[in-house]
Amino acid sequence: MTQAVAARRDGDAFQARIFWRKAACLLDPKSPVTQVGFESGPKGFDDVWVAYAPDRAPNDHEGRPILREHIQCKWHVSVNDFGHADLIEPEWINANRISLLQRARAAQVAHARDGFGARFKLLTNWRIGQTDPLRGYINQKSKTLRLK
């Protein structure tokens, strides 16, 4: 039971740090951040969200502006890694039927149908396994998933 309590507490602290790190940008008049929120947004990517000014928004890996970023924070108390199989297993996110990858797809269709303007990010203290095939699909510069 104490392991579960520690995981919950540490996970909440991790999410809060991400939120406040983004929210602090609101104090900088030169920051592209215009709004920050938490616990709202597309299911599975609702821990923290950030809205950016269109004229100062960060660009995606293809140079297009990202107007909104949805972040899912995944904290683990144990040291480990993850891989492609975890992204399609609902149990990995403590769900019954829908995996993180399915939730990412649903969020993309609902919030950025053409694939532009929104980013859906998984932030975790685990790394992708050294030998996992998923590693080869990650752009090392932008840390994005290459689908082509």
What residues fall within each predicted segment?
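Acidic metal-coordinating catalytic centers involved in nucleic-acid phosphodiester chemistry
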Residues: 1-8, 12, 63-148
